[in-house]
Amino acid sequence: METKDLIVIGGGINGAGIAADAAGRGLSVLMLEAQDLACATSSASSKLIHGGLRYLEHYEFRLVSEALAEREVLLKMAPHIAFPMRFRLPHRPHLRPAWMIRIGLFMYDHLGKRTSLPGSTGLRFGANSVLKPEIKRGFEYSDCWVDDARLVLANAQMVVRKGGEVLTRTRATSARRENGLWIVEAEDIDTGKKYSWQARGLVNATGPWVKQFFDEGMHLPSPYGIRLIKGSHIVVPRVHTQKQAYILQNEDKRIVFVIPWMDEFSIIGTTDVEYKGDPKAVKIEESEINYLLKVYNTHFKKQLSRDDIVWTYSGVRPLCDDESDSPQAITRDYTLDIHDENGKAPLLSVFGGKLTTYRKLAEHALEKLTPYYQGIGPAWTKESVLPGGAIEGDRDDYAARLRRR
């Protein structure tokens, strides 16, 4: 039976990030994904690398600071799939006073190590604005767009580039400790072929299924509860020709993004709905469609109806249960749990997390795993470039060269 240093179960952004980091430190790594890479939560995001402006209202300063710093790192790691984007925030005084927004944006500008992105500014909307006439003022700040699925794929490519192995459509069916090692069994979901490996360490990065794998795959108690929060988006024909995205405030204190996508479309989302079903079966509800249309139509001159929707998508955020009353108040921060058996066979489990902070999450995961591996290499991903990201010149020059081809 083949022995690996580390087996990572889960081919979303957290699993791929941990596997890539571990492989780059010299460990023999195997990553198992039951379906396809980024097939669940990681490809159903708002496709943003952002600090999370709204998290400041929940006093999540550590998370915002880390996310803002990582935003700068990821722009350098993945310039081919991550791009700066300006966000316009229409001011609606009865929801949040201007002074509160200014303080929030000041903190947003300064909490992270912002070096490449312009800071926030105030705006006045004139007669040619795409917004309704009563919306006359607003704010603009910087965040970034990313191709979420390709970010996962690039990390999986890095696993292979660093000597690791990635198996998709291979479901881990069980994992147990035996003689100081993990015995991991898996099955090819297409052919039924069975596999088994030994591993010195195991990572449970199965996202919405993290607790289920504890219960059914390892028959161990999960150290934390998970709350599944559904986020849905609608995709419509491009609602304006501007390059900027919009971040809309709603009466329930939530925010909704309107994001340019693929030149011809706009993504509108997201929602926050408690979800109890199978994560694979998640889909948008009519109430969510009505909610997103209402928030959009409250702000924009160009009105949308159900008939304008060309596509919808939904994902499930696996958030660590902090007993918050409402879905939007649950922390988006991550928790890493590690335990072993007599100093061997560590199990590291990932609860929560964000697309933006995946690299730092992976680095923290390897910090926890390092004591179990003699001779493991140092942290390295902060200065790395993901496969495909080694472009010559700046991003605009690179894009122009591609267009000329």
Language model segments and positions:
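Flavin (FAD/FMN) cofactor-binding and adjacent substrate-gating region
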Residues: P90-L167, S174-G180, K302, D321-A329, ...
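Beta1/beta-strand and adjacent pyrophosphate-binding region of the FAD-binding site
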Residues: M1-N14
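C-terminal catalytic lobe of FAD-dependent flavoproteins
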Residues: S142, D148-R150, M158, M218-I267, ...
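Glycine-rich FAD pyrophosphate-binding loop
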Residues: A23-A44
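Flavin (primarily FAD) binding-site architecture
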Residues: N204-H219
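Core beta-strand elements of the Rossmann-like FAD/NAD(P) dinucleotide-binding domain
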Residues: E2-K4, T191-G201
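Dinucleotide-binding Rossmann-like beta1-alpha1 core, especially the glycine-rich loop
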Residues: K47-N128, I255
